[in-house]
């Protein structure tokens, strides 16, 4: 079944994702306040009292829980006194900008570049040379292609990044000139320079009624782009558990599983991002390592393993069930009525998937708070959590007393 869960890359700009999330939040009645700053908080057994500075002056908010989703410089994390150990490097300079390139350099067949004296540069890939890294990314809807370079142990020019500085960097990395012009359109236009980088992981993701998600809990290299998925999965994992707490249906310890499930995943992503950062660096030693990895990736099993690591499909939570699918990402199954499992997941509820056409939904799931919504597809049975992970699975075709009891235990243990 896991083979039927296709994984692929979607080239969606982050600003578009943020726009969609904001629109959905507004549909659900969420009030989004901009220009407001958290200045302090205190917590007790019943909730958290926030001190906030706003355009009209300071005010307070009382809430049951506080979630810090405020980025790598998280004020919530700092005020909570949660340590953020890790490493800071100062050996790289990354330059990125929207910039126009001469039309004659663009290969219409590939969408990449074909530079005289150098050759083809595929789009969207990290193009490594012995002098650095170059990326050409003609993102759909962008005002101009995104041009990026990264150099190691290079003296930084003082002041903000300019197109002339980026052009000079690209020439050093590629060894040939490439003319860069200002982007067209109204923007927003990116022009950014980053010196060094941080790889850090919060010592803990929870302090009483204060919780951290996304970059507030972990920062790392953007190589491979795992950060967005990691942060969204944090939010979804925490979201349904907080909802159960708010409804009063959460079993004891459910909220504690947020950290026990998500922090190991973040540790693995940090490890992966550091490995990828090492593999893009210049140098003959790295070139040798890359040659070895190329040989290893000739084996489709290794390709799959890396793909699952990058996508997060290799994550398996400890859910107290010994079935091979338990704790794994549920495959996006097609149901008998033509809908897919991913469509059902939008309602934020658990779902009991009956592959046999039997009566797994009765009575084990009946009468429980937040009980699963039965669906039928031709196979055995899965209980899928609101975040899309399998809470329980069985190979038993006909429900018996033992299997019904295990399903009921899974419902109470993980879903309230």
Q: What name fits each language-model region?
A:
Residues 1-4, 19-29, 43, 168-172, ...:
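Helical substrate-recognition/capping region of FAD-dependent monooxygenase/halogenase enzymes
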């Amino acid at each position: 079944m896991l083979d039927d869960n296709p994984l692929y890359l979607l080239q969606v700009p982050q600003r578009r994702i943020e726009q969609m999330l904001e629109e959905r939040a507004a549909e659900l009645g969420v009030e989004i306040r901009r220009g407001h700053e958290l200045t302090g908080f205190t917590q007790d057994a019943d909730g958290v009292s926030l001190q906030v500075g706003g355009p009209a002056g300071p005010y307070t908010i009382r809430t049951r829980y506080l979630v810090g989703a405020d980025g790598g410089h998280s004020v919530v994390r700092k005020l909570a006194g949660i340590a953020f150990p890790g490493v800071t490097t100062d050996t790289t300079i990354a330059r990125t900008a929207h910039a126009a390139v001469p039309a004659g350099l663009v290969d219409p067949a590939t969408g990449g570049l074909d530079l005289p004296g150098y050759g083809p540069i595929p789009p969207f890939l990290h193009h490594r040379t012995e002098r650095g890294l170059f990326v050409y990314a003609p993102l759909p809807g962008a005002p101009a292609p995104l041009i990026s370079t990264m150099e190691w142990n290079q003296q930084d020019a003082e002041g903000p990044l300019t197109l002339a500085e980026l052009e000079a960097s690209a020439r050093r990395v590629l060894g040939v000139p490439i003319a860069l012009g200002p982007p067209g359109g109204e923007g927003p236009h990116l022009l950014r320079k980053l010196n060094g980088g941080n790889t850090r992981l919060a010592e803990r993701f929870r302090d009483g009624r204060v919780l951290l998600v996304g970059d507030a809990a972990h920062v790392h290299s953007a190589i491979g782009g795992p950060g967005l998925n990691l942060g969204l999965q944090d939010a979804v994992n925490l979201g349904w558990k907080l909802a159960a707490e708010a409804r009063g249906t959460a079993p004891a310890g459910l909220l504690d599983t947020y950290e026990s499930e998500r922090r190991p995943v973040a540790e693995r992503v940090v490890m992966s991002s550091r490995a990828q950062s090492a593999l893009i660096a210049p140098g003959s030693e790295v070139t040798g390592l890359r040659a070895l990895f190329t040989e290893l990736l000739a084996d489709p099993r290794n390709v799959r393993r890396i793909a699952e690591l990058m996508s997060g499909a290799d994550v398996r939570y400890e859910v107290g069930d010994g079935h091979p699918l338990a704790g794994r990402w549920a495959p996006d199954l097609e149901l008998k009525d033509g809908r897919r499992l991913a469509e059902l997941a939008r309602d934020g509820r658990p779902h009991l998937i009956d592959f046999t056409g039997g009566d797994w939904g009765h009575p084990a799931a009946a009468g429980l708070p937040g009980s699963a919504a039965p669906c039928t597809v031709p196979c055995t049975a899965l209980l899928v959590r609101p975040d899309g992970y399998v809470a329980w699975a069985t190979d038993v075709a006909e429900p018996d007393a033992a299997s019904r009891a295990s399903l009921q235990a899974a419902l109470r243990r993980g879903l309230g």
